[in-house]
Swiss-Prot record:
It holds the Pfam family ABM. It catalyses: jasmonate + NADPH + O2 + H(+) = (1R,2R)-12-hydroxyjasmonate + NADP(+) + H2O. It is found in: Endoplasmic reticulum; Secreted. Keywords: Endoplasmic reticulum, Oxidoreductase, Secreted, Virulence. InterPro entries: ABM_dom, Dimeric_a/b-barrel, Jasmonate_Hydroxylase-like. Disruption phenotype: Fails to develop blast disease on the rice host but does not affect vegetative growth, asexual development and appressorium formation. Significantly reduces the host penetration ability. Leads to the accumulation of a methylated form of jasmonate (MeJA) resulting in a strong induction of the host defense response in an otherwise susceptible rice plant. Does not affect the ability to cause blast disease in barley. GO terms for molecular function: oxidoreductase activity. GO terms for cellular component: endoplasmic reticulum; extracellular region. Its EC number is 1.14.13.228. Monooxygenase that converts the endogenous (and likely the host) jasmonate (JA) to its hydroxylated derivative 12-hydroxyjasmonate (12OH-JA), also known as tuberonic acid, a compound that attenuates or disables jasmonate-based host innate immunity and which is essential for proper initiation and elaboration of the blast disease in rice. Gene3D superfamilies: 3.30.70.100. This is Jasmonate monooxygenase ABM.
């Protein structure tokens, strides 16, 4: 299974346009063979940042979507002024926790090991889903997870986000230098993602399509 971790910061004046574009993509996205789900979250620590998190059966499924005209047009609009900034990571799910049972996914072959991002400092991203009361702050959420930023153990960056359409559905986005130190709470589902590509608006060295970096 593959994950696309797409963090965006729409221009404040273009936020409604961003939502309109996102909504227009859903019908075709849902019909792509191998598409699993897409959920949007808003950051609790970085005002204006949105996470679009999608899961795909395999890399071919993701390629099917990336080569559609609809996706290409949305990219053009985003780059042409809707998005002030973005950070996109694509990776393979290497371990999952469901109902407190760990499932190690043995699908990372030698080619994929060689393809681990050379640009991004974080080679692993951990995604932990959990529930909080609606409107809970980031300190309360971090406390529930037992997350201690003072003891990073390879933790490069983290954020906690709340689902846009279902307040109270939270996700921890933790970027680790190598493998992750497990962060878990009872009843929480999590995925570990090995990052294969890492790029953004201002650094596109690992992007699959050529666009000149924004200046």
């Amino acid at each position: 299974m593959f994950a696309v971790i797409f963090e965006t910061r729409p221009q404040p004046s273009q936020f409604d346009t961003y939502l309109t574009i996102a909504k227009s993509l859903r019908p075709e996205l849902a019909n792509i063979d191998g598409f699993i789900e897409n959920i949007r979250y808003k950051s609790l620590s970085r005002p204006g940042w949105i996470l679009s998190l999608s899961f795909w059966r395999d890399e071919k499924s993701l390629v099917r979507w990336r080569t559609t005209a609809t996706h290409h047009m949305a990219q053009e609009k985003g780059r042409d002024g809707v998005l002030e900034d973005y950070h996109l990571r694509v990776g393979q799910v290497t371990a999952s926790v469901r109902s407190n049972e760990v499932k190690r996914v043995e699908t990372v072959d030698a080619r994929e090991q060689d393809d681990v991002t050379a640009v991004g400092a974080a080679k692993t991203v951990q995604l932990v889903r959990f529930q909080m009361d609606r409107g809970a702050g980031i300190d309360a959420a971090a406390g529930k997870l037992g997350l201690n930023p003072e003891e990073p153990r390879g933790l490069l960056a983290w954020d906690i986000m709340e689902a846009v359409l279902s307040p109270g559905d939270m996700i921890l986005l933790a970027s680790w230098e190598t493998g992750s130190s497990s962060v878990s709470i009872p009843g929480a589902d999590s995925d570990e993602v090995q990052v294969l590509r890492d790029y953004g608006k201002y650094d596109r060295r690992e992007a699959p399509q050529f666009y000149p970096p924004a200046s």
